[in-house]
Amino acid sequence: MTLNMMLDNAVPEAIAGALTQQHPGLFFTMVEQASVAISLTDARANITYANPAFCRQTGYSLAQLLNQNPRLLASSQTPREIYQEMWQTLLQRQPWRGQLINQARDGGLYLVDIDITPVLNPQGELEHYLAMQRDISVSYTLEQRLRNHMTLMEAVLNNIPAAVVVVDEQDRVVMDNLAYKTFCADCGGKELLVELQVSPRKMGPGAEQILPVVVRGAVRWLSVTCWALPGVSEEASRYFVDSAPARTLMVIADCTQQRQQQEQGRLDRLKQQMTAGKLLAAIRESLDAALIQLNCPINMLAAARRLNGEGSGNVALDAAWREGEEAMARLQRCRPSLELESNAVWPLQPFFDDLYALYRTRFDDRARLQVDMASPHLVGFGQRTQLLACLSLWLDRTLALAAELPSVPLEIELYAEEDEGWLSLYLNDNVPLLQVRYAHSPDALNSPGKGMELRLIQTLVAYHRGAIELASRPQGGTSLVLRFPLFNTLTGGEQ
């Protein structure tokens, strides 16, 4: 019988018989040289054969194993219920597969994955039990180590305050920690990365962005940082190709408090700059008033000198006139410059945002500030801080006057528009104009700028070559209009 004939018949018994006839001892040689531990017992579970791999695994020689029950290898580490299940299955003449903790001759314990099959004769009677087992101690140790590492990593990730997420090449989340899940829940169940509108593919490795997101109705600022992770394919078809599309690790930290502190620091510096500008404007206005007052007697002295004749020899008159002129010159030199920063073009929306942030705490249920613009793209030109000081002076004055009228809730409307190259700011309120013009501030003598807000506003507006209008509103209240040129060309300078 040839091998082709055996394949045509396709009968396992015939194939085995033919191979045995053509190659006597083939199956014995295969079992002897197999790397899998194989043992054979009789129907009473006494060992009748064990291959060399079995002997190496257990530490016993074949002579020591023959006629021994496999319980020789049993250890107390295997639960009794496992053995009960095994024998219940085998007595039903069904194969059983499971894991056992065996004990080698030297006392060492090892974990085996074992298959036991009842062997029946042609009459269906049980003759043998065939067992094949593999030592899986090393693979089990590695598996448990990996599981422990994963558990430890998950515990660490879930206990750090930052949100950690891993995304694939399509920006799909493949792993995240508890903090990220919490962020998503606070966003109403929406994906945080979608709400942030951030894509790691558009961010370079190690790049960081600070982005706002609305969480439970409040704006939070989150720092997003990305790192590329090398990918290893999990598909069996790519066993020989150790590569896969790269993934990206993203760490998202809440930096709202830090940003608020930075913003508060910036606002504090802005307040200091505005205060310095107001103080310089107050000093300049006071010196200008002094110059005007001093100019009258000096003019009178000059007229007296002309009447007496400049060469009349009136030493006292000449000395008084010269002292007056020198005093005027000294005062002129003492007038501080209002050039605190360079003229520039800047967007108006952040300008109003700063104004609102500076006065947010001073407006309550009885005081309302409404800001509108004709276009969100409006810009201003000049010294930004000084123009902000103009509005601040007016708000300070209006709030102080409104405090003297507690029966009337304060309403302030600020509107901005561009008109033929001029920026017009309309400040309307419900404080009577008479109150604005003639109100006296008790702090005028001990606080710079108190009680002279309108004069300081005029000084700053004039310095920017602007215009100011103050009038009563038909429906009651006061309307202040400030106009500033948007380019130097309107005032004779360069654009």
From Swiss-Prot:
The keyword Chaperone appears for this protein: no
CC cofactor: FAD
Segments forming domain PAC: 94-148
Keywords associated with the record: FAD, Flavoprotein, Nitrogen fixation, Repeat, Transcription, Transcription regulation, Two-component regulatory system
GO biological process: nitrogen fixation; phosphorelay signal transduction system; regulation of DNA-templated transcription
Domain PAS residue range list: 23-93, 151-174
SMART domains: PAC (SM00086), PAS (SM00091)
Keyword Protein biosynthesis: no
Function noted in UniProt: Required for the inhibition of NifA activity in response to oxygen and low level of fixed nitrogen.
PANTHER family: DIGUANYLATE CYCLASE DGCT-RELATED, SLL0267 PROTEIN
Protein name per UniProt: Nitrogen fixation regulatory protein
Gene source species: Klebsiella pneumoniae
Organism phylogeny: Bacteria, Pseudomonadati, Pseudomonadota, Gammaproteobacteria, Enterobacterales
Gene transcribed to yield this protein: nifL
